[in-house]
């Protein structure tokens, strides 16, 4: 698949694809090439468990139209602490773009509480712009107001 994931730019350098032993993600290494958001790499590297496990990814693909059912099947909201802000994660959409977010599991965050701050910060800033730009701005409606209903339902209390 040719594409861009969270700020990764195409590189002319060569490398070898390897599988991470901790999170089983495919990463490219060799000739000075390192995949960001991975343990020991230059952008978010550091000690501890593999950061790919905690990363919230946005996957953008313009291959085909995505069709969803006419009903709202599922929406998820997470509260990270009792006084914190609720983050709504949409899983229903229709259009030419695909967004998969996030891959972070709450159980993994509980194991390493330092990672919660990074994920919350990323979700509050970068993800919302990516979702708006690649999903909401190009949504195709066909006599269906489910996105508007979900938005009204979630924003009513704010």
UniProtKB/Swiss-Prot annotation:
What superkingdom does the record give?
Answer: Eukaryota
Family as reported in the entry's similarity comment: Belongs to the UPF0329 family.
Q: What is this protein called?
A: UPF0329 protein ECU06_0050
Q: Which organism is it from?
A: Encephalitozoon cuniculi (strain GB-M1) (Microsporidian parasite)
């Amino acid at each position: 698949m040719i594409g861009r994931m969270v700020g990764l730019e195409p590189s002319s350098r060569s490398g070898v694809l390897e599988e991470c032993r901790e999170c089983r993600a495919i990463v490219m290494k060799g000739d000075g090439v390192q995949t960001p958001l991975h343990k020991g790499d230059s952008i978010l590297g550091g000690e501890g468990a593999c950061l790919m496990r905690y990363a919230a990814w946005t996957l953008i693909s313009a291959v085909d139209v995505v069709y969803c059912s006419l009903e709202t099947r599922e929406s998820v909201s997470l509260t990270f602490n009792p006084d914190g802000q609720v983050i709504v994660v949409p899983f229903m959409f229709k259009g030419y773009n695909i967004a998969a977010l996030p891959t972070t599991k709450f159980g993994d965050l509980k194991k390493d509480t330092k990672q919660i701050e990074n994920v919350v910060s990323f979700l509050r800033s970068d993800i919302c712009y990516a979702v708006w730009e690649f999903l909401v701005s190009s949504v195709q409606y066909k006599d269906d107001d489910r996105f508007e209903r979900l938005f009204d339902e979630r924003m009513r209390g704010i």
